Amino acid sequence: MMRVRFPLLVLLGTVFLASVCVSLKVREDENNPFYLRSSNSFQTLFENQNGRIRLLQRFNKRSPQLENLRDYRIVQFQSKPNTILLPHHADADFLLFVLSGRAILTLVNNDDRDSYNLHPGDAQRIPAGTTYYLVNPHDHQNLKIIKLAIPVNKPGRYDDFFLSSTQAQQSYLQGFSHNILETSFHSEFEEINRVLFGEEEEQRQQEGVIVELSKEQIRQLSRRAKSSSRKTISSEDEPFNLRSRNPIYSNNFGKFFEITPEKNPQLRDLDIFLSSVDINEGALLLPHFNSKAIVILVINEGDANIELVGIKEQQQKQKQEEEPLEVQRYRAELSEDDVFVIPAAYPFVVNATSNLNFLAFGINAENNQRNFLAGEKDNVVRQIERQVQELAFPGSAQDVERLLKKQRESYFVDAQPQQKEEGSKGRKGPFPSILGALY
């Protein structure tokens, strides 16, 4: 594993472990600039009885601290069984990920089309300007998809261009003048209007951009679809499955699946990594930080407490040298569809309060290094020389080494015994419990 130059990063880790001993500010939930609650952070772009499309608010509108994510958006798509999202394209690149259900994704090119059967864990890049449509072929199960959108025309803004004219959406072809349409299709406008748009307003499809399909239509569409690639994660233009290979971290308390840009050309083009993480109820994903990637975490199933540690903003201003370092702790209780942003170099920890699954998009992912602050393996603190440990911590090098070796698990640990013990002692708040679970 690559060695990291870590003086500043280790300082952050040291701050995390010692944060109960320095000036500490806590920001929770609604005052937390990195937390986007599902109930009030999504805008519904379309909804009917067949499904809905929601767009997360712009990250930099949530907080100036998220300015570096101004070019990224999160889109949530859900559809009922036996439905289709009608053909359209957008002025944005998409990285699509199937959270649950099955799908048939069709990508249309000038002289060809490709259809793929998608399953949970499948991912696919949809290049900007590509016409595509999405079918839920299942008879009983809803389809749930999350997309990372990267607009190409305007920072943080993109438009969907639908071919169909519905009650919810005009066909973009209707933007052309009558004579242009007549010349282009070599037909009278009356025929064009009747065939493509509906001769009268009331003749338009009423369901909107997500409509029902018959069993025969689904059967025909399914026949043309190819299965996603589960043998390789390095596909240049076909879907790949995030969970088809062994997890990079795994034990009895959790599993961590990841594909990095170095392993997949689609992710390399976007400079993004994809992670899918399972954590058992009561378990902890140990404190760690990413060296350069900004992580957008999306809760798929379950609930969790998350704690993030940063340096208070005023530390960036000119200050008297004798002023103490001030640490900011950001807490949030996360539920399904909530989004949390983890800046690069900020240590964080996730405590699952029920069986948990979350997806993570890592922005600026190339050559990112994940540095754990506790646990037996990949622990950056344990790599510090003994002489430096004695200078960095109040305890002796022997005490530090003894403390670090107490935690024999790596990556995921069981926090429940510690939480129960401290609950019986009357301790309040999750932070001491989390620290106690580490060592």
Swiss-Prot record:
Please list the residues annotated as glycosylated. N351
Q: Could you share any additional remarks the record makes about this protein?
A: Mutagenesis of Ile-145 and Lys-147 allow the creation of a beta-conglycinin beta chain containing a phagocytosis-stimulating peptide, soymetide, found normally only in the alpha' chain. The three mutants created exhibit phagocytosis activities after digestion by trypsin and the order is wild type < I145M/K147T < I145M/K147F < I145M/K147W.
GO cellular component term, pick one: protein storage vacuole
Return the annotated region ranges for Disordered: 411-439
Question: Which residues lie within the region annotated Necessary for sorting to protein storage vacuole?
Answer: 430-439
Q: What compartments host this protein?
A: Vacuole, Aleurone grain; Endoplasmic reticulum; Protein storage vacuole
List the taxonomic lineage.
Eukaryota, Viridiplantae, Streptophyta, Embryophyta, Tracheophyta
The Swiss-Prot or TrEMBL record annotates one GO molecular function as: nutrient reservoir activity
Keywords, in A-Z order: Allergen, Endoplasmic reticulum, Glycoprotein, Seed storage protein, Signal, Storage protein, Vacuole
| UniProt-listed CDD domains | cupin_7S_vicilin-like_C (cd02245), cupin_7S_vicilin-like_N (cd02244)
Cupin type-1 domain spans which residues? 34-193, 240-401
The gene designation is: CG-4
Q: Which cysteines are joined by disulfide bonds?
A: none
- Protein's recorded name: Beta-conglycinin beta subunit 1
Q: Its domain of life?
A: Eukaryota
User: What is said about its interaction partners and assembly?
Assistant: The alpha-, alpha'-, and beta-subunits associate in various combinations to form trimeric proteins.
